[in-house]
Amino acid sequence: MAAASGSVLQRCIVSPAGRHSASLIFLHGSGDSGQGLRMWIKQVLNQDLTFQHIKIIYPTAPPRSYTPMKGGISNVWFDRFKITNDCPEHLESIDVMCQVLTDLIDEEVKSGIKKNRILIGGFSMGGCMAIHLAYRNHQDVAGVFALSSFLNKASAVYQALQKSNGVLPELFQCHGTADELVLHSWAEETNSMLKSLGVTTKFHSFPNVYHELSKTELDILKLWILTKLPGEMEKQK
């Protein structure tokens, strides 16, 4: 199934309150949408996630068949053979979406935002997609975040990093210890592997948090985003 190009990806945008000098691409989990993720975050925080200078882009994955749903159609960034960390990646669909999302990054660059002022991340499958996008294709972005996400054991990301000798973006990772869909141990293993391959990482565990977003997690994420994409006042300090 052909995927849409980045220029026609449906998206929900939260504009900065002031002058736009940085962009954040936040990718939803499987079966969700950009608007759905924005509203979920708003529900958890009791307000929109907003910044003075950062535009937030919540794109929606185009519908495609999804093997874990027995081939049913869902808004997913790529296909999986199954939801586990010990099977091969569906690299063909991942690579198609890397190109689609590269088009979205290119749009921001053409609008005047430098690559080192663009941050990429996501929840669950969205976090996995962000890791592939950044560490295999865009190692010059400001940073990467992955919430309740994991990579498969023989991920193409690990292979790409073995060949890399440049400066890599920092990874901010969060995971609930009570997550029964994406196990906390899978995320820990992902973090350890990336760290061993030269990625600077921050890993936050949240007791009694399932496969979900938490307010504490989002509050910490917001602070980290501001360290990676400071506004004019912060940069001058």
Curated annotation (Swiss-Prot):
Cross-referenced Pfam families: Abhydrolase_2 (PF02230)
Lineage: superkingdom: Eukaryota
Hydrolase is among the record's keywords: yes
Effect of D179A: Abolished palmitoyl thioesterase activity
InterPro entries, per database record: AB_hydrolase_fold, LYPA1-2/EST-like, PLipase/COase/thioEstase
EC number: 3.1.2.22
Keywords per UniProt: Acetylation, Cytoplasm, Hydrolase
Catalytic activity: S-hexadecanoyl-L-cysteinyl-[protein] + H2O = L-cysteinyl-[protein] + hexadecanoate + H(+)
Any one GO biological process: negative regulation of cGAS/STING signaling pathway
Catalytic-site annotation from UniProt: S124, D179, H211
A GO MF term: hydrolase activity, acting on ester bonds
One cellular component term from this protein's GO annotations in UniProt: cytosol
Residues annotated as signal peptide: none
SUPFAM superfamilies in the cross-refs: alpha/beta-Hydrolases
Residues with N-acetylalanine modification: A2
Function (record text): Palmitoyl thioesterase that catalyzes depalmitoylation of CGAS and KCNMA1. Acts as a regulator of innate immunity by mediating depalmitoylation of CGAS, thereby preventing CGAS homodimerization and cyclic GMP-AMP synthase activity. Does not exhibit phospholipase nor triacylglycerol lipase activity, able to hydrolyze only short chain substrates due to its shallow active site.
Family: Belongs to the AB hydrolase superfamily. AB hydrolase 2 family.
Protein name as annotated: Lysophospholipase-like protein 1
